[in-house]
């Protein structure tokens, strides 16, 4: 007979529960306050554009939240499409060309034309400012 057959399974005793440490308000140090996590939004940029186009018009917090969600959604769609285009062409970098093509694919007709022209203008302006 083997030695394994004669051995009985070890019985496990339940682990002893230790009393939980009580947390008191005096143990919290006043100098160690928890910092609020920053949430990045497009609110300040949306507000600046609003004031450029309609200086005397305001915007509610709910409307700002909706516009912020809209900008995040469009950004995500364009980035996703540009990523697919880069993968199709076996490139690891998303360039201005992929972004431009993604905009043409996602936005309809005239809106795509205006977006491409504004994007081209912004890239040209940025390029000229970095060279100077």
Swiss-Prot record:
Gene encoding the protein: HTB1
Cellular component annotations (GO), alphabetically ordered: nucleosome; nucleus
GO molecular function, one term: structural constituent of chromatin
Family under the similarity heading: Belongs to the histone H2B family.
Assembly notes: The nucleosome is a histone octamer containing two molecules each of H2A, H2B, H3 and H4 assembled in one H3-H4 heterotetramer and two H2A-H2B heterodimers. The octamer wraps approximately 147 bp of DNA.
Taxonomic source organism: Eremothecium gossypii (strain ATCC 10895 / CBS 109.51 / FGSC 9923 / NRRL Y-1056)
Cross-linked residues, Glycyl lysine isopeptide (Lys-Gly) (interchain with G-Cter in SUMO): 7, 17-18
SUPFAM superfamilies reported in the protein's UniProt record: Histone-fold
Modified residues (Phosphoserine): 11
PROSITE patterns: HISTONE_H2B (PS00357)
Function statement: Core component of nucleosome. Nucleosomes wrap and compact DNA into chromatin, limiting DNA accessibility to the cellular machineries which require DNA as a template. Histones thereby play a central role in transcription regulation, DNA repair, DNA replication and chromosomal stability. DNA accessibility is regulated via a complex set of post-translational modifications of histones, also called histone code, and nucleosome remodeling.
Keyword DNA-binding: yes
Protein name per UniProt: Histone H2B.1
Cross-link (Glycyl lysine isopeptide (Lys-Gly) (interchain with G-Cter in ubiquitin)): 125
Region (Disordered): 1-40
């Amino acid at each position: 007979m083997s030695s394994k057959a004669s051995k009985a399974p070890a019985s496990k005793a339940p682990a002893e529960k230790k009393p939980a440490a009580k947390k008191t308000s005096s143990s919290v140090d006043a100098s160690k306050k928890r910092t609020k996590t920053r949430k990045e939004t497009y609110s300040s940029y949306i507000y600046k554009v609003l004031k450029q186009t309609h200086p005397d018009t305001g915007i509610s917090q709910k409307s700002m939240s909706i516009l912020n969600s809209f900008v995040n959604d469009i950004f995500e769609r364009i980035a996703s499409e540009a990523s697919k285009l880069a993968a199709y062409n076996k490139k690891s970098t998303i360039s201005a060309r992929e972004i431009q093509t993604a905009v043409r694919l996602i936005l309809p007709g005239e809106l795509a034309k205006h977006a491409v022209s504004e994007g081209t203008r912004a890239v040209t302006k940025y390029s000229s400012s970095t060279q100077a």
